[in-house]
Amino acid sequence: MNLEQLYDVIVVGGGHAGTEAALAAARLGVKTLLLTHNIDLLGQMSCNPAIGGIGKGHLVKEIDALDGAMAKAADQAGIQFRILNASKGPAVRATRAQADRVLYRKAIRTQLQSQANLTIFQQAVDDLKIEGGLVTGVVTQMGLTLKARAVVLTVGTFLGGKIHVGMNQYAGGRAGDPPSIALSKSLRDLDLPVGRLKTGTPPRIDRRTIDFSQMVEQPGDTPVPVFSYLGTASDHPQQVPCHITHTTEATHDIIRNNLDKSPMYAGVIEGVGPRYCPSIEDKIVRFADKTSHQIFVEPEGLTTEEIYPNGISTSLPFEVQVQFVRTIKGFENAHITRPGYAIEYDYFDPRGLTSFLQTKAIPNLFFAGQINGTTGYEEAAAQGIIAGMNAALQIKDQELWCPRRDEAYIGVLIDDLITCGTQEPYRMFTSRAEYRLLLREDNADLRLTEKGRQLGLVGDERWDSFSKKREAIESTQALLHNSWVRVHHNDLFKEALLNPMQHDCRAAEFLKRPEINYQHLLMMDDLNLPELPQEITEQIEIQNKYAGYIDRQQQEIEKLRKHENTMLPETLDYNDVVGLSSEVIQKLNRIKPTSLAQAGRISGVTPAALSLLLVHLKKSRLPV
């Protein structure tokens, strides 16, 4: 490594944001350096060993559509795959993979080490070099100055990180890793708007001390789903089940009796925790009427005995953790291998960023991941690919890019952050997107891969595969719109049809019937339809069956725009508005916005919530 070399882009941090940022910049052909405090922990899953879920799976598919690493790594490391919301509409269906931590790190490292234009170096960063309002490089822990034309910071929970277990606290970026204290101070000296957030993790348990007979087994799906558009089920390692258990009233009693020892409830922690991933202490206090809470018992990998009990994140003292864990069904003899803990860390107000994730104060300095106030691997990776790409585009003097809200969940994520900011760790949900019928998991490639190719992100293998898929969809749709299903075909479909056809119709129209799928149409020899892979026939079916819903949603969006200046009465009690989440009610009652437009700029108040407000105003005969 030549210390005098000028890198185009330096990425600081080797987590989920940093790895995607470094790969994206390198794919665009610029000289990229990835700095990490530990090469062995590139792509480390610091908390739960899982990828995807509601809203999050959509982000993973979009990252994959732009030729990112996360979906491919999840396929190579996933030890259980499930489609969540499988019985619901395609807009909210989401893929989730339980992952082997070791295999995931290995898959990410393999992609990094095989990427052209990318150098990896193990060094923590203590400072940025700033000259003339621009960043010119970084200073490492051992005093090396590394020069760059752009820098991407993806430092996770390491900035000013402080770990809490009971009343004990110590500096740390995560358990076993040092924090970035010097870099945190350097960034604060730049007068960037800074705050503190908190997250936590549960104790880990030795599988051999668990009685699984008291639990409900949760197998994966068959056939086994895949994450990457280039993936197949043969990419997956051995598949294993998860299990479900529950806390008991004894669990709750122990936690209630020890709340004074919780750093959260004793006022020791200043940072705000994630609303949608509360600690077990929070659950007991906030949902005092519940006699039990569900726990997902998840394996950490194929070569470890450690189990991740998803649902009991805690910062209570270790001896209290042992007590309450052993009151949970199946955990009566549990041996804790690692204590649960809370960690608080610095983040910077994302309203100080452009939509390209560059800081407004220093235009060649980019932020991605938890430094922007988000929580979750997927949210971090989504920001990473955008920040790394835009850092490279800036170097190449090309126009920067970020998807719009109607193009991608990545666009929703970034727009929410830079427009509204966040005072609590931001997690993606499908409910945050007003265009969710357009932004499905199944069509992320159709939405983004062509743009990714234009930008230089998408390689030849993905582009060739995508082009063939798109051609198959378009040519088959043309056939369906120009072919007819006749009334006399009623006999052919009599076992499937809920109601017989009354008149001839185009095949595309016939496919809109809920009981009819593409396989039924293949029964008609005169249509000459091709045999196609499931992912293509599924896309064709969805495009036809949901065409009317998508059109209606677009009309709703237009209507909503017309009502942006609708005034909201000061006396309006948002508890009376049917359908609003507790988060939205809480924020609206506290802020009391004067108009629908102002309400829409409040973090967490989605366009769907604005529609509910509009309906309430009309029903209440309040002026609209």
From Swiss-Prot:
Keywords of this entry: Cytoplasm, FAD, Flavoprotein, NAD, tRNA processing
A Pfam family matched in the record: SAM_GIDA_C
Cofactor(s) for this UniProt protein: FAD
Gene source species: Legionella pneumophila (strain Corby)
Binding site for FAD: 13-18, 125, 180, 370
HAMAP family: MnmG_GidA
Function per UniProt: NAD-binding protein involved in the addition of a carboxymethylaminomethyl (cmnm) group at the wobble position (U34) of certain tRNAs, forming tRNA-cmnm(5)s(2)U34.
Biological processes annotated in GO: tRNA methylation; tRNA wobble uridine modification
Predominant place of localization: cytoplasm
Protein name in the entry: tRNA uridine 5-carboxymethylaminomethyl modification enzyme MnmG
Subunit structure: Homodimer. Heterotetramer of two MnmE and two MnmG subunits.
Subcellular location: Cytoplasm
GO molecular function: flavin adenine dinucleotide binding
InterPro entries in the record: FAD/NAD-bd_sf (IPR036188), GIDA_C_N (IPR049312), MnmG (IPR004416), MnmG-rel (IPR002218), MnmG-rel_CS (IPR020595), MnmG_C (IPR026904), MnmG_C_subdom (IPR047001), MnmG_C_subdom_sf (IPR044920)
PANTHER family recorded: GLUCOSE INHIBITED DIVISION PROTEIN A, PROTEIN MTO1 HOMOLOG, MITOCHONDRIAL
